[in-house]
Amino acid sequence: MKVILIKNAVETLGYFSEQLAETFQEMGHDTYFVDYDDLVNTVDGISRFAVPEKTVLCTFNFIGLSGEEVFIEENGRYIWENQGIACINILVDHPLYYHSKLAKPPVPEMRVFCIDREHVAYMKRFYPALPVQPDH
């Protein structure tokens, strides 16, 4: 598996991404960073790194899924969707801050993970059609 992560958008979330990258690499997975300090070059590198259906974006709080123009291609779809990259979105903040994106997910195959059990319960109550992990 190949994993794309994002850094330098939000300091703490970049740190979390770096820690995840280390673990993914220890597990034998290839990793690639989209760097907000060098967006043009690192976004260009996605197409060279990604293998359709074998690559995932692992992001936090909809970074890279919030309508950023750099990730939207000419056909109006996200690069993730066009390149067959699955999206794992880890919500660190409460889901209520992302109502518009949860009500109408930016990509069809997005998996949402919450770090708080109360957030999972909230998701199941207000967005029952959207799969959320962990599923307690």
Locations of regions flagged by a protein language model:
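Extreme N-terminal starter segment of soluble prokaryotic enzymes
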Residues: M1-I4
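Short polar catalytic/cofactor-binding loops
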Residues: N8-E11
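Helix-loop-beta element that forms the nucleotide-linked donor phosphate-binding surface
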Residues: Y122-H136
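Extended catalytic core of nucleotide-activated donor transferases of GT-like folds
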Residues: L13-F126
